[in-house]
């Protein structure tokens, strides 16, 4: 059987809700309850369409600690000066107002599969009949020797959009004349293969305007990357010799940094 959105909703509507809601009250205790953990693009979209397509027949709870979500997609356009930061931000008010979703701003710290409960950092418990876990992507600790999350303010990653993106742009704007912007590209596999090279392109666009003698150095452990021919053609046409990429043949697969 194909498990699509319609199938999921039909299955959830057929479920019998027998658990109480001691900490987070659902609007209708007799309805099946779906809990979504994670309010990024995936989780928020799932919560929205379950609530919308069920026509109120399913109680939907979205657990997300942040009150504002900034998309990583399009954040490169902010770095390049094509978008404002506030255009990347999304609150959760419309999910509650338009679709009746119960938005809970806490960290989810555990799941009890037997009791069908999600534990919250504040000690609360959220009951469910169906559970969707959409926590998003995260860093692989130790993937770049010498760097961990404690160094993110000195050497921002900006792959989780928000304050990190703003910090990275501020550091780019403050680069000395003729300075060097360095980026360690990730090895395969990772989300959005063209993303690092789109970022380089936008940083180059900004530097061409404010610091045209600056250089960009990419340490790339991959022998080739997504849309490489198009990127390299565009870099040469628009930015001349500003961008240099070092591949594994020159040791980029054994990179370390010192924040």
Where are these regions (language model features)?
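Core beta-strand elements of the Rossmann-like FAD/NAD(P) dinucleotide-binding domain
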Residues: 122-130
């Amino acid at each position: 059987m194909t498990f699509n959105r319609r199938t999921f909703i039909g299955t959830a509507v057929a479920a019998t809700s027998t658990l109480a809601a001691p900490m987070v009250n659902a609007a209708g205790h007799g309805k099946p309850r779906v809990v979504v953990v994670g309010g990024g693009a995936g989780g928020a979209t799932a919560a929205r369409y379950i609530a919308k397509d069920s026509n109120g027949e399913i109680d939907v709870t979205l657990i997300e600690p942040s009150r504002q979500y900034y998309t990583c997609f399009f954040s490169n356009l902010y770095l390049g000066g094509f978008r404002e930061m506030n255009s990347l931000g999304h609150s959760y008010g419309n999910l509650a107002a338009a679709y009746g979703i119960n938005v809970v701003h806490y960290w989810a710290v555990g799941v009890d599969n037997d009791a069908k409960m999600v534990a919250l950092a504040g000690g609360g418990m959220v009951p469910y009949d169906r559970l969707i876990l959409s926590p998003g992507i995260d860093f692989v600790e130790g993937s770049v020797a010498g760097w961990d999350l404690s160094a993110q303010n000195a050497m921002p990653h900006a792959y989780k959009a928000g304050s990190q993106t703003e910090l990275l742009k501020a550091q780019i704007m403050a680069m000395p004349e003729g300075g060097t912007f360095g980026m360690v590209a990730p090895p395969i596999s990772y989300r959005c293969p063209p993303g690092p090279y789109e970022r380089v392109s936008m940083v180059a666009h900004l530097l061409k305007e404010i610091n045209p003698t600056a250089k960009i150095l990419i340490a790339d452990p991959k022998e080739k990357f997504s849309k490489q021919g198009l990127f390299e053609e565009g870099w040469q046409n628009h930015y001349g010799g500003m961008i240099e990429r070092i591949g594994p043949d020159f040791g980029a697969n054994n990179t370390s940094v010192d924040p």
